[in-house]
Amino acid sequence: MSESKENTIVLISCVKRKIDTTNGPVPAKNLYDSPLFKKSLQYAKEVLKVGEDRIFILSAKHYLLPLNQPILRYEQTLKNASAKERREWADIVWQQLSKRFSADTKYIILAGKNYLDNLIGSHRISNCQLPLDGMPMGKRLQALNKAIMNKTIL
């Protein structure tokens, strides 16, 4: 990745596994407790060398979520959402991205099908890389582990 990281945004999907927040909100980056989320974040920071201010979580509940945004545990997913609900979710996320970033922003998206389907395309995110696209969960984790270990970009 030779171009400037200043024009690159990494989007990581939220995950089901979360820590307990009965003692109060925690930064979003600390809420999600799955190996896939942790490795995705590690990959973005250590291999892609993107700063935390350029990494966001695609949250089924909170839409575009900065890593340090304090939040409470929640149970919401796009997995069981209707096609209409997923389109509405993508509309909101796209509006947030459009307001925040320029049209020439490059996105690296580490997310599954439910998060990608309505978010990428000619009228949405078109300048993107999907390094984990089409991989089952276990293969994603393997690919991230290997990339982190070898410091190679997927």
Each predicted region: which residue ranges?
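Peripheral peptide segments
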Residues: 1-154
